[in-house]
Swiss-Prot record:
Mutation effect (residue 618 to L): In FTD1; most common mutation; reduction in the ability to promote microtubule assembly; accelerates aggregation of tau into filaments
Effect of residue 706 to R: In PIDB; in vitro the mutation reduces the ability of tau to promote microtubule assembly by 25 to 30%
Gene it is expressed from: MAPT
PTM comment: Phosphorylation at serine and threonine residues in S-P or T-P motifs by proline-directed protein kinases (PDPK1, CDK1, CDK5, GSK3, MAPK) (only 2-3 sites per protein in interphase, seven-fold increase in mitosis, and in the form associated with paired helical filaments (PHF-tau)), and at serine residues in K-X-G-S motifs by MAP/microtubule affinity-regulating kinase (MARK1, MARK2, MARK3 or MARK4), causing detachment from microtubules, and their disassembly. Phosphorylation decreases with age.
Molecular function GO labels: actin binding; apolipoprotein binding; DNA binding; double-stranded DNA binding; dynactin binding; enzyme binding; histone-dependent DNA binding; Hsp90 protein binding
Annotated protein name in UniProt: Microtubule-associated protein tau
Lineage: Eukaryota, Metazoa, Chordata, Craniata, Vertebrata
Biased composition (Pro residues): 491-503
Amino acid sequence: MAEPRQEFEVMEDHAGTYGLGDRKDQGGYTMHQDQEGDTDAGLKESPLQTPTEDGSEEPGSETSDAKSTPTAEDVTAPLVDEGAPGKQAAAQPHTEIPEGTTAEEAGIGDTPSLEDEAAGHVTQEPESGKVVQEGFLREPGPPGLSHQLMSGMPGAPLLPEGPREATRQPSGTGPEDTEGGRHAPELLKHQLLGDLHQEGPPLKGAGGKERPGSKEEVDEDRDVDESSPQDSPPSKASPAQDGRPPQTAAREATSIPGFPAEGAIPLPVDFLSKVSTEIPASEPDGPSVGRAKGQDAPLEFTFHVEITPNVQKEQAHSEEHLGRAAFPGAPGEGPEARGPSLGEDTKEADLPEPSEKQPAAAPRGKPVSRVPQLKARMVSKSKDGTGSDDKKAKTSTRSSAKTLKNRPCLSPKHPTPGSSDPLIQPSSPAVCPEPPSSPKYVSSVTSRTGSSGAKEMKLKGADGKTKIATPRGAAPPGQKGQANATRIPAKTPPAPKTPPSSGEPPKSGDRSGYSSPGSPGTPGSRSRTPSLPTPPTREPKKVAVVRTPPKSPSSAKSRLQTAPVPMPDLKNVKSKIGSTENLKHQPGGGKVQIINKKLDLSNVQSKCGSKDNIKHVPGGGSVQIVYKPVDLSKVTSKCGSLGNIHHKPGGGQVEVKSEKLDFKDRVQSKIGSLDNITHVPGGGNKKIETHKLTFRENAKAKTDHGAEIVYKSPVVSGDTSPRHLSNVSSTGSIDMVDSPQLATLADEVSASLAKQGL
């Protein structure tokens, strides 16, 4: 098998980085998962997928370019626009992962890291000459992108991109979708190739149509395409070829990431867990049957997790298919691996199981070495389309269990010798290297292809710890050689670390059922013809399932397991302090006896001042106060004392002689004294003459009030003649003529006043 493994530079964010030698980046199309319209447009734009000279279209490169970290919008947005329901439906059927599919195949076990997704998901299909960009890195963008891609791939079931898409989309779901929109044919082709790997017969047999389970296939294709070139011509089948209603919810919930599996979209951890749980390595038939069912009829979501050794069903197809896809595991396993991962995804996320019709393209000259892989695919229709989902689930469960046993480490940490993509390894969650026989790059491809499913399974399953994903590297050496042809290292975590959850498989089964109807066209091969359109209503279920699984059972248990509080032992309860029962209680460290001891005071000395010390003599000897009468005989009294009445001050005796002075002779009495009564002041005797002032007569009113004062001069004779009356004129002037006496009186008054100084 000429499987030129193309070295993928895995850029977590660049699906385009999956630069498969054969793959050509189809125009830098970036699908915006957020835009549902992009789904149709992107799918319709699949012309962007220009078939490589090999004829392999590489939508993945664009996806790589477009690959971006999943955004809430991307994750939230429906993967496929309702406008492209047909396309989505067509793509969805492949979404379902047959239970037979191993986790790695389904991409469940391997939650391809962005790098893995970038490098590992895009596998060149050297044989087909087409680099199927299985690793369309899905941005965790809206599932719509994945749906868009799915829509672009008629054969690819539109897997809800719930957990897985969220996981894988970070790798480039958005770009993947964009490319899917542009390179819908490529995506379909790649997915078909992935499905071919899954189914065994390449999708190419499907006429370049995406197998219905293209998304699931995409997960597987991611692994398969990475591991082996996909023979199928670029999946240019019209995105709506299947005419399936976009199973946006389903894709979102589950393996739609698987679709970007080619885009290496890491599955949500919970999703991976679920897928792992549901991924018991199913026989390759399981996935094939599931796919066929998915294509022929709506997938029955029967979750039988029977771990059966991966039977290399369709090994002839698988070998050819893997030869094309360089898928280490038999094509059936590749599909199965995808199927389990997608099936798991479907279970987990109700992803439509990618129909195994696409594997029809698997028959190529290349032998497909089959890597036993946990098949997490839900019971999808087998390539024949006859396999019941239940059978697939059971087979996948058995195979996954066996695969798990066989594959202690699903994730090939070491890049396959053929794989030049070192980045892919880092992204592979599984630590254990896969057996050298199985090319790790194949695992990585499968992981990428199924990684969406696987990643989602991991995310969902609390068993994510369990390395359930089928070791893609466990493929026989022949497969490894094929894988080597595909240079994609199996960096994508080949094994879902979460063991398949028995509880989740039913969900996957339902998704598988959806996928199966969506991909009735290509049950056995990755035919570009998308499976029957899967009802988009299933997508919501898938999404819900996918989102719920993330909770680890341990955490739930821890929450639920609350130790019951034992009932208090009331019999042994003692009363509290202060209760009536404690009335006699004596606190303290025991009984304290207060003993009344009489002190022996005989030796005690009383303090100073006590009655006992009345006779006490202070130290220093006894002091006797002797009363001595003072001898006052020699004492002289002080001055002024009675004893000194007769005392004469020193300095000689002073005699005071009283002389009787004859004042009368020598002294003149002061003025005013009795002696001076007769005294006449100097200037001679003055007589004070008293003059009777007759002011009334002389008075003159200052204000003339018109009244006449009749003054009867006493001097006037008894004559009462009115003319003797002084008539005061209204002017107040006295008629001096009438009263000549007034003139003299006035003169006298003025003179007296002058004398007195008035």
